Amino acid sequence: MLRLALVLAVAAGALCGEPVFSHKTHAPLKIACANCHAGAEVKERAGFPAAAQCQGCHKDWSAKIPSQRVYKVRDFVFFSHVAHKAKTACADCHGDMWQQATVSLFRPVTMIACVECHKEKKATEVCNSCHELGQ
């Protein structure tokens, strides 16, 4: 379900945005984050599912899903899901997605928010671990 929505958005040319999708609608199905965002725990970026996986439930659905960019860090900032997964739960940054009708960021992607979290988790505060030097 979620997978089909994501794939359709990508197929519709939404490569730089996230589909406008209600996780809350699918909450009763108790789908794990990693079922649709494959690789988020082991790769730099969260993955999107293949259409074939979504079509297990959405066999006849051909609607185009509108897209909007939700998360964007500056070009000189590095963010890796795999580096954060060891000490951070998905909900720490994304909130309880199953209660959200639209995709939003629970914790802002700002230097202040990142530094506060790094201090809480006793993570590195070395600038070049997240920033490209010279920027």
Description of each model-found segment:
Residues 13-135:
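Short sequence/structural segments immediately N-terminal
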Residues 2-13:
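Sec-dependent N-terminal signal peptides
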